[in-house]
A protein has these predicted regions:
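Flexible N-terminal pre-Rossmann segment of NAD(P)-dependent oxidoreductases
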Residues: 1-10
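Conserved glycine-rich cofactor-binding loop
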Residues: 15-16
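Conserved glycine-rich Rossmann-like NAD(P)H-binding loop of the short-chain dehydrogenase/reductase
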Residues: 29-44
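The beta1-alpha1 cofactor-binding region of Rossmann-like NAD(H)/NADP(H)-dependent oxidoreductases
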Residues: 60-72, 104
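Conserved NAD(P)H cofactor-binding loop of Rossmann-fold oxidoreductase domains
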Residues: 89-95
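Substrate-binding pocket helix/loop in short-chain dehydrogenase/reductase
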Residues: 97-99, 106-108
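A short, exposed helix-loop element centered on a Lys and neighboring polar residues
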Residues: 122-123
Length: 132
């Protein structure tokens, strides 16, 4: 029995990198996972989880969209009956261009994903977690 047996987890940015690695580690310890990403890589992550015997569902969603965040949190609760962990891991960078060549629109997108995304995750997860 793993340390996270029976826990339900959402990880955003689960399509690659740290999000994928965390997804594999959490489910190896028995967590049930809703893996979220905008990229098709999230489906690969879920396949890897299932290959190691884990339970996971892929959700292609925008971690900076209020409607998407509310939706994937509600889906986790509907699927697993509860929500124990939300890891707002999704993030993007400014790229390698000098700042003088970057646009305000690009920086607004960075803030939407990296700052507003975690706020939305907590905002919509908290009521479920407090009830538990």
């Amino acid at each position: 029995m793993g340390r996270l047996e029976g826990k339900s987890v959402i990880i955003t940015g689960a399509g690659s990198g740290i999000g994928r690695a965390a997804s594999l580690l959490f489910t190896k310890e028995g967590a049930r996972l809703i893996a979220v990403d905008l990229s098709e890589g999230v489906k690969e992550t879920v396949e890897l989880v299932k290959q190691q015997g884990g339970i996971a569902e892929a959700v292609m969603a925008d971690a900076g969209s209020e409607a998407d965040v509310s939706g994937f949190i509600d889906r986790a609760v509907a699927t697993f009956g509860k929500l124990d962990v939300i890891w707002a891991n999704a993030g993007i960078s400014g790229g390698l261009k000098p700042i003088a060549e970057q646009t305000v629109e690009h920086w607004q997108e960075i803030l939407r994903i990296n700052l507003i995304g975690p706020f939305l995750a907590v905002k919509y997860a908290m009521p479920h977690m407090v009830r538990q």
